Amino acid sequence: MSLYDVTVNIQLQKVVKRLDFGIPLIMTAGVTASPAQEGQEQQTPVTHAYAEYTSIQQVKEVFGDSDIISVIAASIFKQENAPKRIACCTTTATNLNALKAVKDQNWRQLILTSLDWDGESKDLTDVFDWCEENKRVLFTSTKSTTKFTDFSAKKGTYHHIVVLYYNDTTEQVVFPEAAVVGATAGKKVGSITYKNQILAGVLPMVLEESELKTYHDAGCITIVSKAGDIVTSEGKALSGQYLDITDSMDWLEQQLRYKVQKVLNNNDKVEYTDRGINLLEGAAISVLKEAYDNGMIAEDPDGLPMYWAKFAKREETEAADRV
């Protein structure tokens, strides 16, 4: 037997994968039955529970070719960098109750076909507030900004609400926000801005610069033509904050919580020692590094990433906390 002064200890570690950031959801709430024909009983509303789909063919098999869900799904899947999966759901519940029912599902971007800009302002603000509180990004479109005065006092807080001004007099395009979702949801978080995203299957608005400024000042974005491409005019949410910043902040919070929790799950015991603290710190740093690699974190003048994780060593903590 050979003798060695070196001992090699190899341990197989579990790789903590990234948690999915969520997929687009197309939802119709308040579904009602078709009017009963003379001599026939009233029909039961046809609804479809939350489910995920990987192609427009799968969506059409469930909803049919002409249903608005299928039309929106087709626009999403038509984009060059479309997401690999989307979710669809129809329900008799109200908009707000419908959202509450799918809160724990794996979705992030929302197209709510039953959101009525001509209806009660409270319905809009209830949906906006819920999406903001639960960090889900609502994409919606309107032909007018007059309704904005009803929630102007809170407009600056809506970092997760994207309003598209779109007045297509030909009515060839319905739910133009679907193209925006399809063009962006399949890309890495932090790797894009939402401005100048190339869109397929939609018509551009023809606006004077002063008109465009008016809509941007109101918190809207729209669809325009630039250098021969049809693109988004701006990349901000209703609050005026860039949507990629909101995405990055939400992603960091989600991934930090997830990866630190996985450390606790994958170890029978994470001791309150420097070693245990280092395990948690390592998980946090791995998230921050990925965020930097994806363009979410800037560099300092020396070209170094501007992030750090400060976990107090055991000796730096209060004695009472170590009991």
Identify the function of each model-found stretch.
Residues M1-V323:
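Surface-exposed assembly/interface segments
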